[in-house]
């Protein structure tokens, strides 16, 4: 293993062999490895000049230093129990040794709707594993493992490179300077994930606390647990494209003053507009043209798509039973998981000030937009067109 690590050390300019061994762990189940941050080879604009970790998460994490990200995760863990008026269990930190022989201090905990988080603190490295497929309340397969509790956990929303990641910062929590960061996306069946849990384990996790989510259309936690994860997974795109899309997801949310920033573990008011900023789930020809024109990706198809033809995403012969999906951009639609804040923002975007809509459940939303577009008429003209 150390012989394999030497070329990797030279290529990535790592400080010690231990760093290479930790980065190379579980390479068979990794989708890609991206070195990001300032002065990093993969840190092109806009990834290089943003402190946000380009991964779809409920709240933004930090790519420039491990401490804000660890704080966000622990803060979200504590807030989750506080919102349910529960006493958080004490964190159990253990001194362990990884398969490569390096010692670390580690812990793990479940943060709904993010999933299972594992933290490893090495002498000169900080490693965080995030498996967002683990959710014993909303991502359980009711038909799997009923007769055999020892059977492997079968979930509806499987592990995916879009949201299952391993993050490595070169440095410890007390370093004052910015740290190089590696973002390793993990495929289904990765270590430290859902494949290591049985149905009995999931049952124990589900019974460890009350149901942590609210009602459909009212709770952003539930919206992220179901809509966001199902809306971003199974994307046949390269690592850099996934990173740029995740960055757009966070940038929209973080620009709203009521939403959390880096180092804050509370939930935003909703995710509908962030998903709109994220763009099409499987990519599109229009988005590829824009990324090429802004020189974020190269001109070749392999710079944008990844294994698209291998998995038959674009069928050559139309088949109504297996239609696949189109390369081109489609209209964005809101779902039943959209929160009232989401609907209000959409009304403000689409309707002139004073116009309103009434939803199926009888709630009325009136546009409060202060900007009047040139191609729009007054409210009276808008109502006259409707009557006509």
UniProtKB/Swiss-Prot annotation:
Disulfide bonds: none
InterPro entries for this protein: Foamy_BEL
Top-rank lineage group of the source organism: Viruses
One matching Pfam family: Foamy_BEL
One Gene Ontology biological process: positive regulation of DNA-templated transcription
Protein family according to the UniProt entry: Belongs to the spumavirus protein Bel-2 family.
Miscellaneous information on this protein: Bel-2 expression is low.
Designated name of the protein: Protein Bel-2
Organism of this sequence: Simian foamy virus type 3 (strain LK3) (SFVagm)
Name of the gene encoding the protein in the UniProt record: bel2
């Amino acid at each position: 293993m150390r012989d394999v690590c030497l070329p990797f050390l030279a290529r990535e300019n790592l400080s010690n062999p231990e760093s290479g061994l930790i980065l190379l762990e579980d390479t068979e189940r990794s989708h890609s490895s991206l070195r990001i941050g300032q002065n990093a080879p993969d840190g092109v604009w806009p990834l290089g000049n943003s402190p946000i970790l380009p991964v779809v998460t409920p709240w933004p994490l930090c790519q420039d230093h491990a401490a804000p990200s660890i704080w966000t995760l622990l803060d979200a863990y504590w807030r989750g129990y506080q919102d349910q008026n529960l006493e958080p269990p004490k964190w159990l930190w253990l001194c362990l040794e990884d398969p490569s022989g390096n010692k670390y201090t580690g812990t793990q905990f479940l943060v709904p709707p993010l999933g299972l988080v594992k933290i490893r603190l090495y002498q000169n490295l900080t490693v965080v594993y995030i498996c967002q497929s683990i959710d014993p309340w909303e991502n359980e397969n009711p038909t799997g493992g009923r007769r055999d509790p020892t059977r492997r956990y079968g979930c509806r929303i499987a592990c995916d490179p879009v949201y299952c990641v391993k993050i490595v910062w070169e440095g410890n929590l007390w370093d004052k300077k910015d740290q190089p960061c590696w973002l390793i996306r993990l495929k289904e069946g990765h270590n430290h994930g859902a494949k290591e849990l049985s149905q009995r384990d999931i049952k124990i996790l589900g019974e460890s606390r009350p149901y942590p989510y609210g009602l459909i259309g009212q709770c952003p936690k539930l919206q992220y647990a179901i809509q966001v994860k199902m809306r971003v997974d199974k994307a046949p795109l390269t690592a850099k494209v996934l990173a740029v899309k995740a960055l757009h997801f966070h940038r929209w949310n973080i620009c709203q003053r009521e939403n959390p920033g880096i180092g804050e573990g509370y939930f935003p008011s909703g995710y509908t507009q962030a998903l709109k900023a994220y763009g099409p789930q499987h990519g599109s020809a229009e988005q590829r043209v824009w990324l090429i024109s802004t020189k974020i990706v190269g001109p070749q198809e392999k710079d944008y798509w990844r294994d698209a033809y291998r998995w038959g995403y674009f069928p050559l012969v139309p088949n109504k039973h297996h239609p696949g999906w189109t390369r081109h951009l489609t209209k964005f639609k809101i779902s039943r998981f959209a929160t009232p804040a989401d609907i209000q923002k959409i009304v403000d975007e689409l309707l002139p000030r004073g116009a309103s809509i009434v939803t199926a459940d009888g709630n009325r939303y009136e546009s409060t937009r202060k900007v009047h577009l040139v191609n729009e008429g007054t409210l009276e003209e808008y109502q006259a067109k409707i009557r006509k």
